Amino acid sequence: MVRIKPFRAVRPPKEHASEVASRPYDVLNSAEAKAEATERSLLHIIKPEIDFDPIADEHSQPVYDKAVENFRRWQSEGWLRQDPEEYYYIYAQTMEGRTQYGLAMCCHFEDYLSGAIKKHELTRPDKEEDRMIHVRNQKANIEPVFFAYPDDAEIDAIVADVVKNNAPEYDFTAADGFGHQLWVIRDRKTNDRITEIFAGIPELYVADGHHRTAAAARVGQECRAKNPNHTGCEEYCYFLAVTFPAGQLRIIDYNRVVKDLNGLTPAELLEKLNESFVVEDKGTEEYRPAALHNFSMYLDGRWYSLTARPGTYDDNDPIGVLDVTVPVSYTHLTLPT
């Protein structure tokens, strides 16, 4: 079972939602964030180094202090407000004409430590430490992590009913073309039922946000150690997550661009790749990977399927077996990073 709870969100009023919303902290660098941030953008809180001229070291204490200052200011200016009661929220994301619906909730850090929240990536200590400092200083999770849960028909029905019978609190399209909608579930019985259903779900899976999840768990452990009367119900035990049903999930492509062929012709490159991969010409229509250890490649106007040959990866190597590692490790090519 997993432990979840509704919460009092600190969020923008309707009229400021699209102005406050921003891309996640780890998909753009400081210079890009500074150029992109508008006056009310959340980037001033999640990447506060942009408020210094020149841009400051993102790991310096003044930058961490600036994040706290900005979070407080956004609330005092009315750009962020806390809801009066604890709710669950439905968050919908639309991309390329396809919408997936998730539930925003608080998850328990001890479920992460026990393995009920499953992770599939290692974390970098420096990034984990950075996010931990932000959580500790803010006493809040500014960005949610992204979890998946096994499909549940009753949860699907609850979400569908709320979406059908209520206007969204937010409804806007961001600059990248992604649509964003949010509904507040204000009915207490519905919220109680969501909690009950998730108590019967054995596991959640981290889809995105390994560093933020690990950081929240570390802060929870710190607070637990300092509290001799710890019960497990304290606010510090919980962190912000948006959970999506596995059947709706679509993982966005994470592609690599090779700037040159290192002196090879396209034909020579394909010949080299054939040493480690079964290469199939898929023509001019876009091809997406169809299975584990299968990759797509666009070269000289055509799409190719690359399937790693047996022996090019070690099933016992937790890093080497990952699809993110296989293409670079076993092409026998010097690829730019």
Outline where the language-model segments fall.
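C-terminal, non-catalytic macromolecule-binding modules
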Residues: G301, L306-S329
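Conserved small/polar residues in nucleotide/adenosyl-binding loops
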Residues: Y330-T337
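N-terminal extension/subdomain marker
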Residues: M1-A160
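Metal-assisted phosphate- and nucleotidyl-transfer catalytic regions
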Residues: D130, K189, L273-R302
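A short, charged helix-loop
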Residues: Y170-K189
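A conserved active-site cap/scaffold subdomain adjacent to cofactor or substrate pockets
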Residues: Y236-G283
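Active-site beta-strand/loop microenvironment that shapes enzyme catalytic pockets
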Residues: V184-P228
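A residue-level signal for conserved active-site and pocket-lining positions in enzyme catalytic cores
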Residues: V135, G209, H332
